[in-house]
Amino acid sequence: MIQAIVTDIEGTTTDIRFVHQVLFPYARERLTPFLRAHQQDDDITALLVDLRREIAQPDADIETLITVLHGFMDEDRKSTVLKAIQGIIWRTGYLQADFRGHVYPEVAQQLADWHQQGLKLYVYSSGSVAAQKLLFGYSDAGDLCPLFSGYFDTHVGAKRDVSAYQKIANQLGIAPQALLFLSDIRQELDAAQLAGWHTCQLIRDLPDNDSAHPQVNRFDQIVLSLFTE
């Protein structure tokens, strides 16, 4: 029996276009002036130290680091440092109501129903935990954060790595066969399945005919009783 559901965000709870056409450009436009202005802030200083370590350039100056981060954005690299900095920039956007976090129309109600049924709900996304909380806390369906029991990002590993799902199961103290992972990306679901999890693929746009995972178009099409040990 499923005890907990772990969901991806981009393409799963949230339209990928919101991420790529709203969030990413917002951060890209503000990245350079933000880092120049805040490079001495304690949290930013720590992130820049991590970035220098990531690129193996311990003496890189701020302009070099800005160039590196723009390169990361160009290639959509899942850099933990980049995601953290983006999240800090997005916080201003949410607080100023420049945008609201998009969730598909049925998502909020289905999450609330599962929560009411006693299921534990978690998020696992390549975006930072801080960014995840902002998206759901300032969503166009209201504050959804009370529905979630926890959040995971790339600190536990990449989403296509089996070990990441093993770590999450261990941290939750829940047997893998009692966990359901929701994502639109087949390779992420493959990794979760290899870790012993149940999986369900959200098909919001183009079909994925190469996938062997159960598929639905909406959260309210997910029938939990079909996922048995």
From Swiss-Prot:
Record's keyword annotation contains Metal-binding: yes
Pathway(s) this gene product operates in, as recorded in its UniProt entry: Amino-acid biosynthesis; L-methionine biosynthesis via salvage pathway; L-methionine from S-methyl-5-thio-alpha-D-ribose 1-phosphate: step 3/6; Amino-acid biosynthesis; L-methionine biosynthesis via salvage pathway; L-methionine from S-methyl-5-thio-alpha-D-ribose 1-phosphate: step 4/6
Keywords noted in UniProt: Amino-acid biosynthesis, Hydrolase, Magnesium, Metal-binding, Methionine biosynthesis
Sections of the chain in a coiled coil: none
EC numbers on record: 3.1.3.77
GO biological process, one term: L-methionine salvage from methylthioadenosine
Cofactor(s) listed in the protein's UniProt record: Mg(2+)
Matching InterPro entries: Enolase-ppase_E1, HAD-like_sf, HAD-SF_hydro_IA, HAD_sf
Cofactor binding summary note: Binds 1 Mg(2+) ion per subunit.
Top EC group: hydrolase
UniProt GO molecular function: 2,3-diketo-5-methylthiopentyl-1-phosphate enolase activity; 2-hydroxy-3-keto-5-methylthiopentenyl-1-phosphate phosphatase activity; acireductone synthase activity; magnesium ion binding
Reaction catalysed by this enzyme: 5-methylsulfanyl-2,3-dioxopentyl phosphate + H2O = 1,2-dihydroxy-5-(methylsulfanyl)pent-1-en-3-one + phosphate
Subunit structure and binding partners: Monomer.
UniProt record similarity statement: Belongs to the HAD-like hydrolase superfamily. MasA/MtnC family.
Function, in words: Bifunctional enzyme that catalyzes the enolization of 2,3-diketo-5-methylthiopentyl-1-phosphate (DK-MTP-1-P) into the intermediate 2-hydroxy-3-keto-5-methylthiopentenyl-1-phosphate (HK-MTPenyl-1-P), which is then dephosphorylated to form the acireductone 1,2-dihydroxy-3-keto-5-methylthiopentene (DHK-MTPene).
Descriptive protein name: Enolase-phosphatase E1
Organism: Yersinia pseudotuberculosis serotype IB (strain PB1/+)
